């Protein structure tokens, strides 16, 4: 008999451990942020958004808003508000969180018993 995972797999703020996103909401693990690798999520929680601004990114011009932890104010990434390029429209409304700004919690090894 196999036992499943215990609890949800969550990503938390690196500074204060506030819960920010669920592993199940990852769209892509292959995004590049200012300081390295990042994940694209469909949803984020316990965050505040900065002002919308036009930003030239590797994939073109977008309107984005910085994503900050609602507890400590740490900037964790950004939210895509608008993509001008038709091929980038899938990003609209989604969140990019930088890997070094979030930590995994609740990622347990799958254990077989019996």
Model-derived regions: residue spans:
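A short Gly-Trp-Pro
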Residues: 1-114
């Amino acid at each position: 008999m196999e036992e499943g995972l215990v609890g949800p797999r969550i990503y938390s703020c690196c500074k204060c451990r506030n819960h920010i996103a669920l592993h199940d909401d990852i769209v892509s693990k292959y995004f590049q942020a200012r300081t390295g690798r990042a994940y694209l999520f469909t949803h984020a929680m316990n965050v505040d958004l900065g002002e919308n601004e036009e930003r030239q990114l590797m994939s073109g011009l977008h309107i984005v808003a910085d994503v900050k932890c609602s507890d400590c104010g740490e900037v964790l990434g950004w939210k895509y508000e608008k993509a001008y390029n038709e091929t980038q429209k899938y990003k609209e409304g989604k969140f990019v969180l930088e890997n070094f700004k979030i930590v995994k919690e609740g990622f347990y090894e799958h254990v077989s018993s019996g």
